[in-house]
Amino acid sequence: MTPSLAIASSTSTMLLCPKLGTCSMSLSTCTPTSHSKIHHFHLYSLGKRLFTPWNGFKQLGFSTKPKKPLFHFIGKKGRCKGKVVYASLFGVGAPEALVIGVVALLVFGPKGLAEVARNLGKTLREFQPTIREIQDVSREFKSTLEREIGIDDITNPLQSTYSSNVRNTTPTPSATEITNNSQTAVDPNGKVDESKAYSSEEYLKITEEQLKAVAAQQQEQTSSPKEDEIEQQIQPPANETAATVPPPQKPESESSLPSDL
């Protein structure tokens, strides 16, 4: 081997950069014409992340450009705002629709596919009124349900409040009897004024007075049997004392006089 035809062996050097966390490797090749080429490869450090098949290429430093979406919202100035719109029909995206179209072409052919499309269009036109009727019925059903639910929600609190008010303002039987018997106002002196009718305040005052009178009568009725029992308990000891006390003895002078006579 001559030095002109000899090829120098490639030398590799490994440099570690602790701050950057990367390792750089340089390969140099020498030719007899003193023409050298240096290739630099940079391998990023793996770090503490797991080496999974999804992020393996990213960890090794190989990156691919992301594919651009099909549709973009373009602003007034012609700049893309980053919003993406993916067209879909009945949950079928654009690539799936392309696959379905290719399969349909292979199965039916161009003429058969055109006939199938025409038949589908006719059937859809025929079913349009039925679909509209179904939509109208569903809307009416929803509206009726919402109305019934709203009415129930409104009536339930009204009924509860009305029942609570009735419970709180139920008059006593004596008050109801008085209202049924007489509907005229009564003066404190006992005179009846037929010209005046009961007002709410007077009605409340009368009911309060009647309640007080009923309570006083009940107290008197309960107190009277207690007093009778107390008197009965007090009387027997007096009779016993009268029975136990002996009659008074006569003096001796009175007892001796009849004997002398």
UniProtKB/Swiss-Prot annotation:
Q: Where is the composition biased (Polar residues)?
A: 160-186, 232-242
Q: Which domain of life is it from?
A: Eukaryota
Q: Decide whether keyword Glycoprotein is in the record.
A: no
- One Pfam family linked to the record: TatA_B_E
**Would you indicate the residue range of the signal peptide?**
none
Q: Which residues lie on this side of the membrane: Stromal?
A: 110-261
**Keywords on this record?**
Chloroplast, Membrane, Plastid, Protein transport, Thylakoid, Transit peptide, Translocation, Transmembrane, Transmembrane helix, Transport
From the UniProt entry, list the residue stretches annotated as the region Disordered.
160-193, 214-261
Q: For this protein, what is any one GO molecular function term?
A: proton motive force dependent protein transmembrane transporter activity
Q: Which GO terms describe its biological process?
A: protein import into chloroplast thylakoid membrane; protein transport by the Tat complex
Under InterPro entries, the record lists:
TatA/B/E, TatA/E
Listed transmembrane segments: 89-109
Q: Which residues lie on this side of the membrane: Lumenal?
A: 87-88
List the membrane topology term(s).
Single-pass membrane protein
Report the transit peptide positions: 1-86
The UniProt entry's sequence similarity note says: Belongs to the TatB family.
What is the annotated role of this protein in its UniProt record?
Answer: Part of the twin-arginine translocation (Tat) system that transports large folded proteins containing a characteristic twin-arginine motif in their signal peptide across the thylakoid membrane. Involved in delta pH-dependent protein transport required for chloroplast development, especially thylakoid membrane formation. TATC and TATB mediate precursor recognition, whereas TATA facilitates translocation.
The record's note on quaternary structure and interaction partners says: In thylakoid membranes, TATC and TATB form a large receptor complex, containing about eight TATC-TATB pairs, which binds the precursor protein. Twin arginine signal peptide promotes pH-triggered docking of TATA oligomers to TATC-TATB receptor complex, inducing a conformational switch of TATA that results in activation of the translocase. TATA dissociates from TATC-TATB upon completion of translocation.
Which PANTHER family does its entry note? Answer: SEC-INDEPENDENT PROTEIN TRANSLOCASE PROTEIN TATA, CHLOROPLASTIC, SEC-INDEPENDENT PROTEIN TRANSLOCASE PROTEIN TATB, CHLOROPLASTIC
Protein name as it appears in the record: Sec-independent protein translocase protein TATB, chloroplastic
Q: Which gene encodes it?
A: TATB
